[in-house]
Amino acid sequence: MTGVQTCALPISLGRRFRALKLWCLIRERGVSGLQVRLRRDIANARWLAAEVERTPGWRVLAPVPLQTLCLRHEPPGLEDEALDRYTLAWADRINRSGAGYLTPATLDGRWMVRVSIGALATERAHVDALWQAIRAAADAARR
């Protein structure tokens, strides 16, 4: 391979190195450190799911066994394509603002948003601020 900087090539995560990322994380944080982080992130995701369920017009669309939450705002009067456009609009507002980074995806042919909580320094206050920003973006997209 001439002209290729092999130092810039990533490690192949095939059969032999599939668990390399996890191994590095366990070596850095230890098993107990990884457990603490996962428990915190799962608790934050479940807290957010409870807040979403408690808020009229908002739905959690799938179980939350780990730290990813699938949600959608379904205000009265919006259905099908209009609801899809609205969902994409408020998710885009959040992503452009930098308040969070959400992943729009389809579920049963309709757009929804995935929130994944897992950054190293994420605390409950960050998740609460994101929830407030999501509701504000949804309100602004509705106008």
For the regions a protein language model found, what residue spans apply to each?
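Short, small-residue-biased leader/transition segments that mark boundaries at the very start
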Residues: 2-9
